[in-house]
C-alpha cells in the first residue's frame, strides 16, 4: 500500500464531514488544508471563518487561504507540503498548475450521480427536479467543471418529504464512505476509471440566485412543493405577499401538499386559526414554517397568533 500525503481543499460543513472521516481513519497523513479566505458576514460584517478553517484550527492542521490560486507564493507553499494527492470537496475550480501538481492527481467528491447535475448546486436541483434517487461520485479533476474520469459512485433514494437539509446530511455520510473507499483504491493502485459520457439529456446544477429561488405559483402543486423543499433551509424559496395596502417578500421553508380540485384564484392565501394554505394548480400548499421581514423563522400557527390575514391576501 502506498503512503498517501494529502492536501484537502474545501469550505463548507459538508466538506468538514469528509475531512473528519479521513482524519479519524488515521490511515493517511493530512499535510495541509486549503480553504476560502476569511470574509465579513452578517449585519455587523464581522469576519467569519469557513467551517473547514474552524476544523483545521481545532485539529492544528497546516492551513492555507489563498485569494489567488495562481499566486506564486501560494504555489510554492503548496508544493512545499510535498503531497502526493489532493482531495477537493465543495471548493472552487482549480487551475491546472494546482490539480496536476501531485503525483497521484487530484480527485473531487461531487454530490450527484455524474454526469447529471454537474455544477454548483447538485443537491438542491435533484430535489427541485423531483428526482427519486441521487448519490455521490468521486472523479479525477481535469480542466473542465465536473467532467473528469469517474472513480466510483454511490447511490441513495430521495423520499418525497426530504428537504435540502435532510438530503445534505445523508449525502455527507455517503460521501465519507465514497472518499475512504477511493483513498483505499488509490493507495493500493487498483483504480479503474470510467469516462463520463455526454448526452443531450444531461441535467445541470445551475448556480442558485434570487430569480431561480422565487416561487412560481402558476406551476403545478408538485413543482411548487419540490422547489420549496429543495431550497430549505438554505438559501430558501421566496415570494411576494400582498394583503390590503401591504406588499413585501417572504420566505417559505416547510410545506405539505394537499391535492384537491378547487376554484380559488391561484396564489390565494387561505387561513384558519392554525393553518396557512396557498391555492396552486392542482391543490393547496400548506405552509408549515415561514419568515416575514424583520421576524425570525416561525411556525405558521405562531405567526397566526399575532397576525390576521384578509380574504384578499395573495402570494405571487
UniProtKB/Swiss-Prot annotation:
Keywords: Protein biosynthesis, Transferase. (6S)-5,6,7,8-tetrahydrofolate binds at residues 112-115. CDD domains: FMT_core_Met-tRNA-FMT_N, Met_tRNA_FMT_C. One of its GO terms (cellular component) is cytosol. Its EC number is 2.1.2.9. It comes from the Bacteria. It catalyses: L-methionyl-tRNA(fMet) + (6R)-10-formyltetrahydrofolate = N-formyl-L-methionyl-tRNA(fMet) + (6S)-5,6,7,8-tetrahydrofolate + H(+). It holds the Pfam family Formyl_trans_C. The keyword Disulfide bond does not apply. One of its GO terms (molecular function) is methionyl-tRNA formyltransferase activity. PANTHER family: METHIONYL-TRNA FORMYLTRANSFERASE, METHIONYL-TRNA FORMYLTRANSFERASE, MITOCHONDRIAL. Attaches a formyl group to the free amino group of methionyl-tRNA(fMet). The formyl group appears to play a dual role in the initiator identity of N-formylmethionyl-tRNA by promoting its recognition by IF2 and preventing the misappropriation of this tRNA by the elongation apparatus. Belongs to the Fmt family. NCBIfam families: fmt. HAMAP family: Formyl_trans. This is Methionyl-tRNA formyltransferase. It comes from Flavobacterium psychrophilum (strain ATCC 49511 / DSM 21280 / CIP 103535 / JIP02/86). The lineage of its organism: Bacteria, Pseudomonadati, Bacteroidota, Flavobacteriia, Flavobacteriales. The gene is fmt.
